[in-house]
Each structure stands twice: as structure tokens, then as C-alpha cells.
Amino acid sequence: MAFQDLITQIGCLGRFQILHLIFVLICFILVVPHTVLENFTAAIPSHRCWVPILDNNTMSDNNSRILSQDDLLRISIPMDSNLRPEKCRRYIQPQWDLLHLNGTFSTVTEPDTEPCVDGWVYDQSTFLSTTVTQWDLVCGSQTLNSVAKFIYMTGIFIGHLMGGHLSDKFGRKFIVTCGLLTLAVTETSVAFAPTFLIYCSLRFLTGISSSCIRTNSALLILEWTSPKFQAMVMALIFSAGGIGQVLLGVLAFGIRNWQHLQLAMSVPVFFLLIPTRWLSESARWLIITNKPQEGLKELIKVAHINGIKNSRDVLTLEVVKTTMKDELEAAETKPSPLVLFRTPNLRKRICLLSFVRCVSLISTVGLLINLQYLSNKVFLLQCLYGVVCTPANLLGNFSMNYMGRRTTQIIFMSVMGISILSITFLTQEMQIPRLVLASLGGAISSASLTSTAVLSNELVPTVIRATALGVIGIFGSAGAALSPLLMILMTYSASLPWIIYGVLPILSSLVVLLLPETRNQPLPDSIQDVENKRKSSREVKKDAVAKVTPF
């Protein structure tokens, strides 16, 4: 017997689970968008240097009063290679000769230019204000925008490292509550951050709390749900994240001031703290941490909410201890992560799966947090990403069942890479093709992550599955954290980051060929099962060679 037998006695999917699931779904709808919020709050609008003759309203000049804005811009700002005004330099002196006022003057030497020493003028047609316009994160300081995203993703990485340990020590409910409070306070404070350094510090704390909330809220509902409903619950949770992205796109379209949008996405999180007082702690965690009496109390409460009668007669302390005997013994001997690397076949699987997860998240995060570089229709693209999330996961589930896990993963990662690479060959004027390819890449990346998770779960043995998935998850979080830094390479070439984002999944798809297929295969229960499978495959190859050798 196991804890799932107790779940069966109190109701597999009753009123209690539905209410808890609704709470978790709302959490994901409100929390997930904070990862991609900087697509709008940190968007980089069109900009140019501030020049006195054009932007100083008090300045009076006989020539400037009769010239159009385009003419004034022409004599003040040099043109780049695309014949557009330079974003980071201006003429030291107005170049009146460029207007050919005398009709005969020709410039012999290139006019002297200088950086934007007086600041910048920003286009407000799309965004009234962003963090970029507030702290002038353009030109020489543009890399700080990527650094801010890196700091947030590093927070998620730290949260992934801390979340599991804190959850095992203090419980799922406590960590979810603390995470919601921290996220609500930090993200609300972000809107009033006086300096860029404070802004980055608050976003770092947001990353930690966001990771803890998502991990532990999902864990909380899964530990109260029967295994046969867990796949459905996870699908709903992924879909909730997609709904959150659509919500963000709609709000960002209506709210063009970054501080107002920040508050619109942060203040509602405070209201999630109200229902946390009625959340039930995981009975499984309570029992395993030597709190069987409290665990029993939670089980009886859940049975009552689900309408199970006479639960006090069926559920006793002795029944709970007997049912959880095996899990209590397993909890006393927690395997070290080093166990994963002591045997050759398991070590190979862990290394390959970690590489695939890391690369998948580098490209996926690169797509999600850099929408502005993919299309001018950033609001529409954000909504499309959210909309395609659910059908993409359904497609992935169908493909894994009929084509196999490995084949599905190879196809999805290859298509994702090709989609990203194709965008680099399209000009900014080709908005519809760029929008289609970006949406396709986003959809496939979501399905690819799902298939990666399934493959990882089925390739590691039960006895150390939690430890193995934790190690693989750490490598994935590291990839997500590194992803924003690749955008710094745009200072050398505008296409270079996207070429890397596209090439990495294609290379990773080749690595998947080294992993075994798991469709319709029994899950390995022990490390010996993994190693025996390797030996048996070798014996099969030897037998095949022996049979063909005589011929």
C-alpha cells in the first residue's frame, strides 16, 4: 500500500481537489506572465540623440523656424547604413550644407559626430514609457537590458535550488504563501524603484519567489491528486500559463506606461494571499516529516469536504502508519546526487538529458523574452504565444503516443531550430512571415519542453527519480539564466544571437539519438534496471553479429 491508497479513500478528484486546482490555476495565470513582463516594461523604443536645434523649444533661429522637422533631423543626425537616423550619434554642428541651400556646395570630408551627450528622444507611438526610457538603457548602456533579464533568470535558478530544500523543511503551503507575499511586495515595489540597481535587485527576488510558487503550488495539488488525474492536472496548469500570457498581451496593449502595467500585474497577487489560509498542507509531507497526527487531521478534513462519510472510522493513525510504511523507510535514506554518476549507463542518461534540457531552455527563453526583436506586432505575438501553448502540448502528447518520445523530441527540436534560423533571413518589413515563424517556434518550443520532461521522467529509475529530475532541472535553469546574455552579442551582429538560438536545438536533436526509446516500455525501478538494460542490449547485438558472421 502507499499514500495513493489513502487518496482513493478520501476522494481522487472531489470538491477539495477542484477548489485547490482553481487556486493553483489562478496562481499560474498571475505569476507566469512576470517572466515575460519585460517584453513590454523593458521594450526598447525607437530613439535618437537630443539636439538643441530640433528639441529645444526655446531656441530661436531664422533658418530653423522655416525648415520642416525632417530637414532639421537631416542636418542634425547622420544616417546609418539603412538610411535611417543614427540612434547613438549626432553631428557636432548642424550641417546646413546637406540641404544644398546654395546649390553648389559639396562636402569634402565626413562631418564630425559625437555621442548623445545631452540624452535621447524616444518614440512614444508604441510605448509611453519603459525602463529603457527611464534610465536611458540604450547605445552604450543597452547591454544592461540583457543583464536585467539575466538577473531575473538567475533568481529563478536560485529559487529552483532553494525551493525544494525549503519545501521539504517547512512544507508546501508555507513556501507558496511566503512566495506569493514576496512576489507581490517586490513586483509592486519595482514600479517605484528609484534606480536601476534597486530595480534589478527587486527583480532578482521576484525570480526566486516566482520559481518557488510555481514548483510548490503544482506539487501541492499533485500530492492531493490520484495518479490517473495527474496528467490532466499538469495539462491544465500549462494551459493556465498560456492564459496568463494572453492576459499580459491584452493588458500591455491597453496600458502603455511601464509602471502602470507593472502595478496591474502585481497588485492582484496580494488578493491570492486571502485564500492561502484555507489551503491544506500536503498530508504526505506531514506524515513523512514525522507529523502523522497532523497528516491524519488533514486527510479527515479533505474527506469531509469531498463528502466521504465515516472517514474517522476508516482513517486512523495506525492505518496511516501502515499505509505509509514503505515511503517512510524510503524517506530515511535519501540518495546523494553523486549516485547518479557512479554507474556508466545512468551517468550517460543524466548527462545527455541535462544537456538537452539546458539547450531547450536557452532557445525557448530566448524566444519568450525577446519578442520585440522578432516582430513589430509584439502585443499580437504575445497573445499568439499564449494561445498556441495548449494545442501545441496536445500535439506533443499525440505525437509521443504514436511516434515515440525520442522521434517526437528530435522532430520538435529540429523544427524549432529551423523556425528561428528562418527568421534571421527575413527582413523587418516581412512582418507576417516573421510573425508566423515566431509563433510556430513558440508553439514547438512548448511541446518540446513537455516531451523533454516526459523523456526525463521515463529514463531515470524510481528510487532516485526526484533527485535525478532535480539535477536535470538545475541544468535547465542554468540554461534559462544564460539565455538573455546571448543578446549582448547583438553588438557584434544583429543576427548572431538568433543563429545560436537556432543552431543549438538542431545540435541537441542529434544528441537525443543517443537516448533509448521509452514508449510502451516499463519504467525502471532501480539503478540495476538501467544497467541491466544496457547489458541486455549489448547481448542482443552480439547474438546478431554471431548469426551473420558465418555468411
Curated annotation (Swiss-Prot):
Q: Which reaction does it catalyse?
A: estrone 3-sulfate(out) + glutarate(in) = estrone 3-sulfate(in) + glutarate(out); 17beta-estradiol 17-O-(beta-D-glucuronate)(out) + glutarate(in) = 17beta-estradiol 17-O-(beta-D-glucuronate)(in) + glutarate(out); dehydroepiandrosterone 3-sulfate(out) + glutarate(in) = dehydroepiandrosterone 3-sulfate(in) + glutarate(out)
A GO cellular component annotated for this chain's UniProt record is: apical plasma membrane
Ranges annotated as biased composition (Basic and acidic residues)? 530-545
**Which residue ranges run through the membrane?**
16-36, 146-166, 174-194, 204-222, 235-255, 260-280, 350-370, 378-398, 410-430, 435-455, 469-489, 496-516
Q: What is its main location?
A: membrane
Q: Which InterPro entries match?
A: MFS_dom (IPR020846), MFS_sugar_transport-like (IPR005828), MFS_trans_sf (IPR036259)
Q: What does the UniProt entry say about where the protein is found?
A: Cell membrane
Q: Which Pfam families match?
A: Sugar_tr
List the membrane topology term(s).
Multi-pass membrane protein
| Keywords assigned | Cell membrane, Ion transport, Lipid metabolism, Lipid transport, Membrane, Steroid metabolism, Transmembrane, Transmembrane helix, Transport
Tell me the segments the record calls region Disordered: 524-551
Specify the domain of life of the species encoding this protein: Eukaryota
GO MF: organic anion transmembrane transporter activity; toxin transmembrane transporter activity
Name recorded for this polypeptide: Steroid transmembrane transporter SLC22A24
